């Protein structure tokens, strides 16, 4: 197929597709003004939020958290984005019926020089009843996942990764996915990079369709995979392409990933018609739902791709 090249360095170049343009939506920016004062005797900070100016929030650290990790945690985009979400239009503190009393920083995991994961406990109370709502938070920030569909000889294949997932104790079959490295919000750029690292396919940004951009504005155009305990918000992208059967054969079982980062990945291709029953990965099942409904609404094409189109 013209325009398709299999590179020895594990990169594949896919031709451009005239898929529907990705919708561009952005979160409204909330200017957060915090007044902080530190205590020399313990790791504490007093934060004043705009929504409750007369009720300072005490932020403290559990035993074992260093002063530098405590400061980095408070200054991190993970923590500040969580505070912004509290005061956003649909935030917990928006209507004044609840109040944030204190936050206890319990764990900080560094990814190089930046905070990758943050664990804390927030004490938020309903003002009318005085009852505290569950507030254990595992903060990891925004992420992306990509549904890659490759058509070949009348069959459509989904491209998945097979990875070691220590939290589950299992090897999991899942969509290519990854976290944003910073708070600049380049979701589509991160999606393209993750596909290249995990699958060995080089895509173009303009060929990606943001399936989460079709959601209602009240969602913020993101999906929360586990809102009961984690702040992660995810964008799900779609890529469709047509390839030769030989490409399917070469991708199947291919070993990829950044070994120096502990990524031991195998590429698995599954017929799309069987995808919904082949894995318990929530990202896969979410992407199927988004893709199928977007097709039903005419937001993405349901027609098969033609060679050289």
Curated annotation (Swiss-Prot):
GO terms for cellular component: chloroplast; chloroplast stroma. Mg(2+) binds at residues 194, 198. Residues 1-60 form a transit peptide. InterPro entries: NUDIX_hydrolase-like_dom_sf, NUDIX_hydrolase_dom. The keyword Membrane does not apply. Its EC number is 3.6.1.21. It is found in: Plastid, Chloroplast. Coiled coil: none annotated. Keywords: Chloroplast, Hydrolase, Magnesium, Manganese, Metal-binding, Plastid, Transit peptide. A motif (Nudix box) lies at residues 179-200. GO terms for molecular function: ADP-glucose pyrophosphohydrolase activity; ADP-ribose pyrophosphohydrolase activity; ADP-sugar diphosphatase activity; metal ion binding. Its cofactor is Mg(2+); Mn(2+). Expressed in roots, leaves, stems and inflorescences. SUPFAM superfamilies: Nudix. Mediates the hydrolysis of some nucleoside diphosphate derivatives. Can use ADP-glucose, ADP-mannose and ADP-ribose as substrates. Regulates the intracellular ADP-glucose levels linked to starch biosynthesis. Belongs to the Nudix hydrolase family. This is Nudix hydrolase 14, chloroplastic. It comes from Arabidopsis thaliana.
């Amino acid at each position: 197929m013209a325009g398709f090249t299999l590179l020895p360095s594990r990169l594949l170049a896919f031709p451009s597709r005239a898929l529907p343009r990705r919708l561009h939506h952005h979160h409204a920016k909330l200017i957060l003004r915090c007044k902080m004062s530190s205590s020399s005797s313990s790791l504490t900070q007093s934060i004043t939020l705009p929504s409750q100016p007369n009720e300072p929030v005490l932020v403290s650290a559990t035993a074992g958290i260093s002063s530098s990790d405590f400061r980095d945690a408070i200054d991190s985009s993970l923590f500040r984005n969580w505070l912004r979400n509290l005061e956003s239009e649909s935030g917990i503190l928006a209507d004044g019926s609840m109040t944030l009393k204190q936050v206890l920083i319990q764990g900080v995991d560094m990814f190089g020089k930046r905070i990758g994961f943050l664990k804390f406990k927030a004490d938020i109370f309903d003002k009318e009843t005085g009852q505290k709502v569950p507030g254990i938070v595992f903060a990891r920030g925004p992420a992306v996942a990509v549904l890659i569909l490759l058509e070949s000889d009348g069959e459509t294949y989904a491209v998945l990764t097979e990875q070691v997932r220590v939290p589950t104790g299992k090897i999991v079959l899942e969509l290519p996915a990854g976290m944003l490295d910073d708070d600049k919000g380049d979701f589509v750029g991160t999606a393209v990079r993750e596909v290249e690292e995990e699958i060995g396919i080089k895509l173009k940004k303009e060929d990606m369709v943001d399936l989460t951009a079709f959601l209602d504005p009240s969602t913020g155009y993101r999906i929360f995979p586990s809102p009961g305990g984690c702040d992660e918000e995810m964008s799900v992208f779609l890529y469709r392409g047509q390839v030769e059967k030989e490409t399917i054969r070469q991708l199947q079982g291919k070993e990829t990933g950044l070994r120096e980062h502990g990524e031991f990945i195998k590429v698995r291709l599954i017929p799309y018609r069987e995808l919904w029953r082949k894995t318990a990965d929530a990202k896969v099942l979410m992407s199927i739902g988004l893709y199928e409904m977007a097709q039903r609404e005419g937001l993405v094409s349901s027609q098969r791709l033609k060679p050289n189109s």
